[in-house]
Design a protein with these regions (language model features):
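Bacterial N-terminal signal peptides that target proteins for export
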Residues: 1-11
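Composition- and surface-driven signal marking solvent-exposed, interaction-prone regions
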Residues: 4, 23, 288-289, 329, ...
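Bacterial N-terminal signal peptides
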Residues: 10-20
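Short, aromatic- and cysteine-enriched interfacial helices/patches
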Residues: 20, 139, 846-847
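A subset of signal/propeptide-processing and intrinsically disordered low-complexity segments
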Residues: 22, 126, 283-284, 545, ...
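Kelch-like beta-propeller repeat domains
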Residues: 25-374
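Membrane-embedded helix-loop-helix hairpins and adjacent transmembrane boundary segments
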Residues: 371-851
C-alpha cells in the first residue's frame, strides 16, 4: 500500500515537473500542393530549378517518356520551362508558353540571386554542354539569354550564388575542382579543390554562416570509375575568405553514417542546412550490379519495380555545433534529382524522380514552424516587474522639485548606485543577448574587448572627469562650447540627439525580435511594453528614477545570468567536467589569437577596438557622462567608475561562460535547437524558453527586458537633458526652473514615442537594410564626437575650424575604410579617434592655434 502511494506521488511529481517546463516544438507540414502540367503524369528530373522574382522556374530536365529503363527505354530531354506561382498561399504550376531553352538539357546545375537564374552545363543526347545561360524577367516577359561558357573539360556538380559570385563545384581531369564565376566580369577563378575523394555528381552544395564567417558546405555525392561507383557521406566546409577546406561531421541518421546522393538541400535559419530525402545508394549499387550481369534480367526488373521510393526523412545540419539530426520522418517518400527552393517562407520541391526511372508530377510544399508558448505564469512575472518600474517612477516624481534634481539628482546619489547604473546602461539587452551568442557561435576572442574597461577607467578619471566636475555640466557638450565654440557644441549635441533616437529604436526592436522568435510574444507588444513603461518612469522620476531603476535592473539581469549559467551546466552530460572537456576540445576558450589579421577579432583588434570604443562611451556619451554628476563629489564618482569597471570583469566571465555552456549543451542535444532561428542572438532566450521551468523563464525574460530598459531610460533621459540644456535654454534664455523640467518631460515623451514608432516601423516594413545604413552612418559620427573631446583635452593647438575639419575628416576616413577594406568594424572606434585627432591637429597648422 505504501509503495503504491509512493508510486502515485512520484508519477504526480514527474507530471508536475514536466508541466512547468516551456517547450519549443518544431513542426513540419509536408504535402503535395500542385502538379506539373505534363502528359500521362510524367514529370522532369535533373531540371534547372531556381527562384526568379516571386516564381519558381523548372527549366529542362529529362524523363523516360516512351519506355522505362527496365523496358529498354532511352532518356529524353526537355527544352520547356514551367513556372510555380503562389497565389494567396495556393501553389499552381503551368508551362511558360513561347519560352524554350537553347537546346533540350538536363542534369546541369542552377544558381541565382533571386532575380536571375543561371543554368550551368548539363547534358542531352548529344553529350555534355559547357554553356551557361540565364533566365530572368517576369512570368509574362521571361527571357533566356546566353551568358558565357565553362572552362574546357570542367564538369559541374553543384553551384551556389553568393554576393556577386557563383561558386561551382565539379571535376576536371579526374580530380575535384572549384571555380568562382564573377557575374559582373564573367571571368572564372580557380579556387582550392576539395581535398576529399573525387565526387562528380549528386552532391548538395549550400551556403550558410558557421557562426564565425561565411562558408559553403559540400554534402555527399557519388563518382564512378574503373573501380566501380563510389558513394560519399562526407561533409566538407569551404571558407571563401581563406580559400581552405575543413572536414566536418559526416552525414548520418541517428549517429549511423549514411551515404547521400541527389538529395535537396537549402539554407534555413541562421545556422541550419536542411536536407530533404536523398538516396543512400544501397539499391542503386544493387541495380548497377544486376545490370552488369546479363544472366539475371528478371531480378533487375524486380529491383526497379519493387523499389519503395527514396528516403522520407528531413535531416538538419547545424553549422555551429557541427551536428546532424533527423528533423522528421514523413508519410511520403521525397523525390530525388531535384532542387529545393524557398518561396514566401515555404520550401518548394518540384517534380524530380519518385522511384528509379519514374518521374514525379508533384510539387511538394514544406512548411516548418517552431511553436512556443510563453504561458500566463511567465506573463505574470514580467507584468509584476513592469509595475515595479512604473511605481518607481511615481515615487521619484514626487521628490523632483527642480531641474538640478531632475537632471543631476541633486548630487545625492550614492557612489555605488551610480557605478551600478553606469554598468547597467552599458550592458544593454543587445549585449545581454549578443555576448553569449558570440561565445556560443565562435569563441572567447572578444573577451579582451570587455577587459579594456580596466584600461579606460584611469584615463577617464585622470583626464576627463576633473573637467566635467569642475564645469558642473549637465550636458557633456557644454565643455565643447568652453573649449571651442557654441557652434561645435550644437553640432555635437544635434548629432548625439539624432543618434539617440536611432539607438532607442534599435534597442527596442532587436530584443523584441529575438523574444518574439522564441517566446511567441507579439513583437509589437514587446516594443510597447518596454517603450511605454520606460517612458513613464524615466520622464516622471528623472535621473533618480533612471539610476535606481538601473540598480534594480542590474541586480535582476546579473542574478538571472547566474541562474542561467548554473542551470545550463547542470543540464550538460558530465556536469561541469563535461562542460570543460567539450569546450577545451572544441577550442571555445581561445582568447589569445596573436595573428595580425585585422579582419577578425584577434587579440590586437580586441584591445585597440575595445579601449577606443570604451573611451568613446565613457567620455562623449551623455547617457554615461550625466551620471558622473549625480554623485556628491569627485571622489565618489571615481569610486563609482571603479566599481563599474570591476563589475565588468566577473560579468564578462559569466556571459562568455553562458555562451560556451550553450554551445556544449546544444552540441549534445542538437534536436532541441530551433531550426528556423533567424538570428544567432536568439540562442540564449531560446534556451530560456525551452529548458527553464515556467516562472524562472519568465524571470529571465524579465531580465532581458531589464537590460533593454536600463539602456532605454538612460538614452531618453540623456536626450532630454541635451535638448533642454543645449537648445531650449539658449532659445528661451529667461525660462524658469519649472519650465525646464516641464520641457524635459515633454521632450522625453516625444523622443521615446518617436523611438517606439520607429521600432514598430522596423517590425512592420521591409526597411531594415535602409535603417542599417542610416544607423551605420550615425555610428561613424560617434567616433567624431569622441574625437572632439580628445582634441579638446589633449592639445591646446586645435581651434574651432580645425576641430570641425577633424570631425568631418574622421567620417570620410571611416567611410573609405568601410568601402575599400575588409577591416573589422570593431576597429572603427580606434580608426575614428586617431583620424579625427590627426586631421584636426594637422589642419591647425593651416587654420592657426585654438584657445
Amino acid at each position: 500500500m505504501r509503495n503504491r502511494r509512493m508510486t502515485k506521488v512520484a508519477v504526480l511529481a514527474t507530471s508536475l515537473l514536466i508541466s512547468i517546463f516551456t517547450v519549443n516544438a518544431t513542426e513540419c507540414t509536408v504535402g503535395k500542393a500542385a502538379v506539373m502540367p505534363v502528359a500521362e503524369k510524367h514529370g522532369s528530373a535533373g531540371a534547372f530549378i531556381g527562384k526568379v522574382g516571386d516564381i519558381v522556374l523548372i527549366a529542362g530536365g529529362s524523363d523516360f517518356e516512351n519506355a522505362k529503363p527496365w523496358e529498354g527505354g532511352v532518356k529524353s530531354y526537355f527544352d520547356k520551362v514551367w513556372a510555380v506561382t503562389d497565389a494567396g498561399g495556393r501553389l499552381s504550376c503551368r508551362e511558360v508558353e513561347d519560352v524554350r531553352l537553347p537546346v533540350p538539357l538536363g542534369n546541369g546545375c542552377a544558381a541565382g540571386d533571386g532575380k536571375t537564374m543561371f543554368c550551368i552545363g548539363g547534358m542531352n543526347a548529344d553529350g555534355r554542354s559547357e554553356d551557361i545561360f540565364t533566365l530572368s524577367g517576369s512570368l509574362d516577359d521571361l527571357k533566356v539569354r546566353s551568358f558565357c561558357s565553362l572552362p574546357a573539360g570542367f564538369v559541374p556538380n553543384a553551384a551556389e550564388y553568393h554576393k556577386g559570385y557563383i561558386y561551382i563545384i565539379g571535376s576536371r581531369d579526374g580530380a575535384n575542382s572549384l571555380l568562382r564565376l564573377n557575374v559582373g566580369s564573367r571571368q572564372f577563378k580557380e579556387l582550392a579543390p576539395c581535398p576529399g575523394t573525387l565526387v562528380t555528381e549528386g552532391s548538395c552544395f549550400v551556403y550558410q554562416h558557421n557562426g564565425r564567417e561565411e562558408a559553403f558546405y559540400l554534402i555527399g555525392g557519388r563518382s564512378s570509375g574503373p573501380d566501380g561507383i563510389f558513394m560519399e557521406s562526407n561533409v566538407w566546409e569551404y571558407l571563401p575568405t581563406h580559400d581552405t577546406w575543413n572536414r566536418k561531421a559526416s552525414f548520418n541518421d541517428g549517429g549511423k553514417p549514411l551515404s547521400l546522393m541527389y538529395g535537396s538541400a537549402v539554407k534555413y535559419g541562421s545556422a541550419h542546412i536542411l536536407v530533404f530525402g536523398g538516396d543512400d545508394g544501397v539499391e542503386f549499387l544493387r541495380r548497377d550490379s544486376l545490370g552488369r550481369d546479363e544472366s539475371r534480367p528478371e531480378e533487375l526488373v524486380e529491383a526497379f519495380l519493387g523499389h519503395k521510393g527514396f528516403s522520407n526523412k528531413i535531416f538538419a545540419y547545424h553549422t555551429i555545433t557541427d551536428t546532424w539530426t533527423t528533423l522528421d520522418s514523413l508519410d511520403l517518400s521525397l523525390p530525388v534529382v531535384t532542387t529545393a527552393v524557398e518561396l514566401n517562407g515555404k520550401i518548394i520541391i518540384p517534380s524530380g524522380e519518385a522511384r528509379p526511372g519514374v518521374r514525379s508530377e508533384d510539387i511538394i510544399e514544406v512548411s516548418i514552424a517552431d511553436k512556443a508558448s510563453f504561458g500566463w505564469v511567465n506573463y505574470l512575472v514580467v507584468i509584476v516587474y513592469l509595475l515595479l518600474m512604473m511605481g518607481m517612477g511615481f515615487y521619484f516624481s514626487r521628490r523632483n522639485n527642480g531641474s538640478d534634481k531632475f537632471f543631476k539628482g541633486g548630487g545625492s546619489i550614492p557612489w555605488w548606485a551610480a557605478g551600478i547604473s553606469i554598468f547597467a546602461t552599458a550592458l544593454s539587452a543587445i549585449t545581454f543577448l549578443s555576448i553569449p551568442a558570440k561565445a556560443y557561435a565562435a569563441d572567447w576572442g572578444m573577451f579582451m574587448y570587455n577587459m579594456t574597461i580596466i584600461l579606460t577607467v584611469p584615463v577617464v578619471i585622470n583626464f576627463y572627469l576633473p573637467l566635467f566636475r569642475k564645469l558642473k555640466v549637465a550636458s557633456a557638450y557644454e565643455y565643447l562650447k568652453e573649449r571651442f565654440s557654441g557652434s561645435v557644441r550644437w553640432l555635437a549635441s544635434a548629432f548625439f540627439c539624432l543618434f539617440m533616437f536611432t539607438r532607442i529604436a534599435i534597442v527596442l526592436f532587436l530584443p523584441s525580435l529575438a523574444l518574439n522568435a522564441v517566446t511567441g510574444i507579439n513583437i509589437y507588444l514587446c516594443i510597447l511594453m518596454m517603450g511605454v513603461v520606460t517612458i513613464i518612469y524615466c520622464t516622471m522620476g528623472g535621473i533618480e528614477a533612471v539610476v535606481w531603476g538601473d540598480v534594480v535592473q542590474g541586480i535582476l539581469l546579473v542574478g538571472g545570468a547566474i541562474i542561467s549559467f548554473v542551470w545550463i551546466v547542470g543540464g550538460i552530460k558530465g556536469g561541469f567536467d563535461g562542460f570543460m572537456n567539450v569546450a577545451v576540445e572544441q577550442s571555445k576558450f581561445n582568447i589569445l589569437n596573436m595573428s595580425l589579421d585585422w579582419t577578425q577579432p584577434v587579440f590586437w583588434v580586441a584591445i585597440l577596438g575595445g579601449f577606443s570604443n570604451q573611451l568613446l562611451t565613457y567620455t562623449s556619451d551623455q547617457s554615461v557622462v550625466q551620471k558622473y554628476l549625480t554623485v556628491k563629489d569627485t571622489k565618489g564618482t571615481e569610486k563609482g567608475l571603479w566599481l563599474n569597471g570591476l563589475l565588468s570583469i566577473p560579468i564578462a566571465f559569466l556571459f562568455f561562460g553562458i555562451g560556451t555552456a550553450l554551445f556544449v549543451f546544444f552540441r549534445q542535444e542538437p534536436q532541441l535547437l530551433n531550426v528556423g532561428m533567424s538570428n544567432t542572438d536568439s540562442i540564449f532566450p531560446h534556451y530560456i524558453m525551452c529548458r527553464l521551468p515556467v516562472g524562472i523563464s519568465g524571470l529571465l525574460i524579465a531580465a532581458i527586458f531589464a537590460a533593454a530598459m536600463s539602456t532605454l531610460s538612460s538614452n531618453i533621459n540623456s536626450s532630454t537633458t541635451v535638448m533642454c540644456e543645449d537648445f531650449y535654454t539658449k532659445i528661451r534664455k529667461n525660462c524658469t526652473d519649472a519650465q525646464k523640467v516641464r520641457f524635459a518631460r515633454v521632450s522625453g515623451i516625444i523622443v521615446g514615442t518617436l523611438g517606439v514608432l520607429m521600432a514598430i516601423a522596423l517590425a512592420t516594413f521591409d526597411i531594415a537594410s535602409l535603417w542599417d545604413q542610416f544607423n551605420f552612418f550615425l555610428g561613424l559620427l560617434t567616433s567624431s564626437l569622441g574625437g572632439l573631446f580628445l582634441m579638446g583635452i589633449f592639445t591646446k593647438r586645435i581651434g574651432t575650424r580645425s576641430a570641425v575639419t577633424g570631425f568631418v575628416g574622421c567620417v570620410v576616413v571611416l567611410l573609405l575604410f568601410h568601402r575599400f577594406s575588409h577591416v573589422t568594424s570593431t576597429l572603427y572606434g580606434f580608426l575614428g579617434l586617431v583620424s579625427c585627432f590627426l586631421i584636426g591637429w594637422l589642419s591647425s597648422f593651416v587654420f592657426g592655434k585654438g584657445r
